[in-house]
Amino acid sequence: MKTTISYKTTNILIEKLKKQENIEVISNKGFFKKLFNNKKYADVYFHSGSLDEKSIKNIKNSKITIVNSFSIKNKILEELKISSERIEVIYPSININIENEDTIKIDFYKKFNIDFDTKLIFFTAKNFKTSGIKEFLDICSNLNYSNFKIIIAGDKRQIGSLQFSLPKYKKLEEKIILIDDYKNFDELFLVSDIFLLPTHNKSFATNILKAMFCKCVVFLSIKNDAKEVIDVFASMSSPTDVTIAFKIDAILLDEKELENIKEQNNKLAKECSIENNLKRFNEEISNI
């Protein structure tokens, strides 16, 4: 017997599940289903986004609802007063191939004429403004450590708009590397040392897990649900947290601690690999 699933928006885990023989996706988009209100509810509902009327019906009628953070789980429990056992948290899945890591780094440093002992601080996001690009540049401007470069990557539109703001950051003029529409964004995580995301957004920033998986030290505003996977040292009290520049200086000056945190982050992020998340999901549905 197949387990049925439904979702608002797809993700890596859902796309993998679609290929399993024991999984069937329920769709209620057909004309006649809407006309006769012949709606089916899935065994498992993947919730994302706002808790609207449609989502509430799916949650109440499913056997299990999957969310990507405890913050969302707690909000659902508070508003709907349903059993905690019916809401399961599976953090976003990571599916990155880190083979040839050294070659990728060497090629990148050569391409952009970077000394091999230079540290790289990375920023990327779908929406630069709400993800804290201004705060990112302000923090980097306040660093005392000097031997670093900044990678800022996005689409052509975002990079083009950003260039109008850069003249005010004279101190960073020789340090900024702008990259638009890079062929493989995952490689930018692999070559970087620090991923700094002073975001204003609440929705789980999957890039934090990607960065951790790729052995970056991460810093993140606690406004974001991804705060659940980082420790106190990596947490920013707000996107404008003035202590972060001191923390970055300290970690860049301590090579041993830098490497230690990178390895710890990689170990933690591996728990969210697509293989581990598939295993966890299949264990959950075996109890339905």
Residue ranges and their predicted role:
Residues 8, 253-287:
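A charged, aromatic-enriched C-terminal amphipathic alpha-helix characteristic of glycosyltransferases
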Residues 217-220:
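Short hydrophobic beta-strand element within catalytic cores of glycosyltransferases
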Residues 163-181:
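Nucleotide-activated donor-binding/catalytic signature segment of Leloir-type glycosyltransferases, i.e.
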Residues 232-242, 250-255:
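Conserved acidic donor-binding segment of nucleotide-sugar-dependent glycosyltransferases
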